[in-house]
Curated annotation (Swiss-Prot):
NCBIfam families: MTAP, PRK09136.1. Its EC number is 2.4.2.1. The record marks E181, S235 as: Important for substrate specificity. This is Probable 6-oxopurine nucleoside phosphorylase. Belongs to the PNP/MTAP phosphorylase family. MTAP subfamily. Substrate binds at M199, N223, P224, A225. PROSITE patterns: PNP_MTAP_2. It comes from Aquifex aeolicus (strain VF5).
Length: 277
């Protein structure tokens, strides 16, 4: 099953049939929202609001571990994360889609792994994840190809067919937030190779990898980053841009649900092979 993490507006996809709403209790706390299980074109899909339905969770306090675990509990094997970002690369314009291929992590206070050695939370189950946690193993997952190539390929093809302005690659720099970045920080990120900057892309991608899930990130450039814009940044600007792009986002997501193959042909599910110490 596919899981989608984004805004609650995605629950209103054309043709969606909501089947149930599940309040999942996880060993890592409460997720930021109930998981909505729906059916689209005969396929089951799980939706989760990253910041909560009323946007109650700032980026540094989103319960990322609980969110990914909750999706795992309802049977999700693939996750599509949707988010707004600031543009660092001058080729990026407000409203552009970006299919992320790599990231830089500049977060500070977030719990970004399930595998904490002897301090790991012990869980029930006979799968590899549960066994590693019960045994208190230290795990180092490979992030050479952090985002699922199969999911990225489908997203890129859809964006081409829709003729939406998009970029097939992009490096996402994740900062702690909730404040916006300074112009000097953006200069630094640009020198390090970042194309976009956001506050929620990490640790979602790494946690999904630790759970052997596929993960892809579809970003929308909401505004130029600090120092590039030449004006004061506001949250309202981001909100208004995302509202204008809402229908296009829904079009992409709906087609993605339809066209994503049922059976995985990538290596994401092998992420724990050789990873334990």
């Amino acid at each position: 099953m596919l899981g989608i993490i984004g805004g609650s507006g995605l629950y209103n996809l054309p043709g969606i049939k909501v089947k149930e709403e599940v309040q999942v209790k996880t060993p890592f706390g409460e997720p930021s929202s109930p998981v909505v299980i729906a059916e689209v074109e005969g396929k089951k899909v799980a939706f989760l609001a990253r910041h909560g339905r009323g946007h109650e969770y700032p980026p540094h306090l989103v319960p990322y571990r609980a969110n990914l675990w909750a999706l795992r509990e309802v049977g999700v094997k693939r996750v599509l994360g949707i988010s707004a970002v600031g543009g660092i690369n001058e080729l990026l314009m407000p409203g552009d889609f970006v299919v992320i291929h790599d990231y830089l992590d500049f977060t500070k206070t977030r719990r970004s792994t399930y595998y904490e050695g002897k301090f790991s939370v012990k869980v029930e189950g006979e799968d590899k994840v549960a066994k590693l946690l019960r045994e208190g193993k230290v795990v180092h997952v490979d992030m050479s190809e952090a985002y699922c190539p199969e999911m990225r390929k489908v997203l890129i093809q859809i964006l081409k067919e829709k003729n939406f302005r998009f970029h097939p690659k992009g490096v996402y720099a994740c900062t702690e937030g909730p404040r916006f970045e300074t112009p000097s920080e953006i200069k630094m990120l640009k020198l390090l190779g970042a194309d976009v900057v956001g506050m929620t892309g990490y640790p979602e991608v790494a946690l999904a990898r630790e759970l052997t899930m596929c993960y892809a990130s579809l970003c929308v450039v909401a505004n130029p980053a600090a120092g590039i814009a030449g004006y004061r940044l506001t949250s309202n600007e981001v909100i208004q841009l995302m509202k204008r792009k809402e229908e296009e986002i829904k079009e992409v997501v709906l087609k993605f649900i339809k066209e994503l193959p049922e059976i995985r042909s990538c290596d994401c599910e092998k992420s724990l092979e050789g990873a334990e110490v």
